[in-house]
């Protein structure tokens, strides 16, 4: 199993700290608004990564943080007059609903920042004790000059840095020192008591406090969008390795590529984003997920409705093939031993692709290759029970790994509309004394397994 790590800029063999246990952390949402499809791209990718690692036999514990205290939440509260707590609760709930719609349901623990304030304060205290952080009149800052490896993830030259929007404070020793704790006097804003007075944590310290509490100072995989490499993930490494004295903090850093719209990155700041919730009005969650997985997680994705429509057509091919195989197998001995050389070769190809840095597009291509090479024989009923069972078993594995249900979904509301239409047609036929045609329609419906009573 080879994984591309942003830290080394090369593929590395997966060697967990503990032999069969993998601890994985992915930066979760700041809950002040609905998640957009760019967020969905990241979380579908890591959900699939966990699924495949578990398929290989690893035990994976996956944590995602929830940033429920942040300037964006506070600003939204001031705009709407709704409390920061209620805003965070509302959008956390909606985020979970959106993830469930995309079948992203393998996170073992959602860790809220506000539930880990003691751990955050403790980590800041230890950074001060070790000489890496200092207090000013407006907060506590990490002194990056004290950490010689700052920039090793992003490969950014510290001397050439422009002051980041969140970090520009005149009270800092260096313009690039980043905030660990923000002192706040305004009682209308969320704040907690600390050794440095009332205030709230900076963004970066939340994640390292959470991961240290659950995983210790070193763990296996940290993931997120490529836009988080700097300053966020760089700051995480700086904090954790400084406070623990251990390196590396994380063995494998994985980052998803941008989702693009008309050549620009999809983002809320550019106001060119499409929420998952809105997209689900036009496309099934399985189609959205299939669209995402048709690109490698590290590559850019160009978003358009046409690409989603095309993804839907591709997924429909797989679903119809699965239905064909399942139907023929049901007519035979569905408990037959699975054995088919074509499937064995395809399965090896699929696993090899996924083992090469989770290459989902190539893995999916192997499934279409199987369809192309076997469908005619299935239609001609040339495959025996064991061969059909092998195909179905493989497709069931693929379904689990990709997190996509290959069974055709029945839309009961549309079914009712169709049957009402058929009933109206038959009523009109009988009124015109076309009894033979009406009865023929009835017989065909019965043959298809529907109960019709006149």
Describe each region flagged by the PLM.
Residues 8-11, 17-103:
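N-terminal, positively charged nucleic-acid-binding surface of large information/translation enzymes
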Residues 62-63, 107-111, 222-224:
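Short catalytic-loop micro-motif centered on adjacent basic/acidic residues
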Residues 265, 271-454:
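Structural preference for alpha-helix termini/caps and helix-kink/transition segments
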């Amino acid at each position: 199993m080879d994984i591309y790590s942003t830290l080394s800029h090369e593929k590395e063999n997966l060697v967990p700290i503990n032999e069969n246990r993998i601890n994985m952390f992915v930066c979760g949402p700041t809950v002040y608004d609905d998640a957009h499809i760019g967020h969905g791209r990241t979380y579908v990718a890591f959900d699939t990564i966990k699924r495949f690692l578990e398929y290989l036999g690893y035990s994976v514990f996956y944590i995602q943080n929830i940033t429920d205290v942040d300037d964006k939440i506070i600003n939204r509260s001031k705009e709407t007059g709704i409390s920061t707590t209620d805003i965070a609760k509302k959008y956390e709930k909606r985020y979970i609903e959106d993830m469930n719609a995309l079948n992203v349901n393998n996170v073992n623990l959602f860790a809220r920042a506000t539930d880990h304030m003691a751990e955050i304060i403790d980590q800041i205290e230890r950074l001060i004790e070790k000489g890496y952080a200092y207090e000013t009149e407006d907060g506590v800052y990490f002194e990056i000059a004290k950490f010689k490896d700052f920039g090793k993830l992003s490969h950014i030259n510290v001397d050439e840095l422009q002051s980041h929007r969140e970090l520009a404070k005149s009270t800092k020793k260096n313009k690039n020192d980043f905030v660990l704790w923000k002192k706040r006097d305004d009682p209308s804003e969320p704040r907690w008591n600390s050794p440095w007075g009332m205030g709230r944590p900076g963004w970066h310290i939340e994640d390292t406090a959470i991961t240290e509490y659950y995983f210790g100072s070193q763990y296996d995989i940290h993931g997120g969008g490529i836009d988080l490499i700097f300053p966020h993930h760089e700051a995480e490494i700086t904090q954790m390795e400084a406070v623990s004295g251990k390196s590396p903090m994380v063995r494998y850093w994985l980052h998803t590529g941008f989702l693009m719209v008309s050549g620009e990155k999809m983002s809320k700041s550019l106001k060119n984003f499409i929420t998952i919730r809105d997209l689900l009005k036009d496309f099934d969650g399985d189609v959205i997920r299939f669209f995402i997985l048709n690109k490698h997680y590290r590559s850019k994705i160009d978003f358009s409705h046409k690409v989603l429509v095309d993804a839907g057509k591709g997924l429909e091919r797989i679903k119809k093939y699965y239905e064909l195989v399942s139907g023929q197998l049901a007519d035979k001995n569905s408990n037959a031993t699975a054995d088919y050389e074509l499937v064995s070769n395809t399965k090896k190809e699929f696993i090899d692709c996924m083992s090469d840095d989770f290459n989902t597009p190539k893995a999916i291509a192997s499934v279409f290759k199987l369809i192309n090479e076997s469908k005619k024989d299935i239609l001609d009923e040339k495959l025996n029970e064991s061969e059909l069972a092998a195909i179905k078993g493989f497709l069931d594995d693929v379904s689990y790994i990709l997190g996509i249900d290959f069974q055709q979904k029945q839309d009961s509301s549309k079914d009712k509309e169709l049957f009402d239409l058929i009933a109206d047609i038959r009523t009109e036929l009988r009124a015109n004394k076309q009894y033979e045609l009406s009865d023929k329609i009835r017989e065909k419906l019965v043959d298809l397994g529907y109960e019709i009573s006149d």
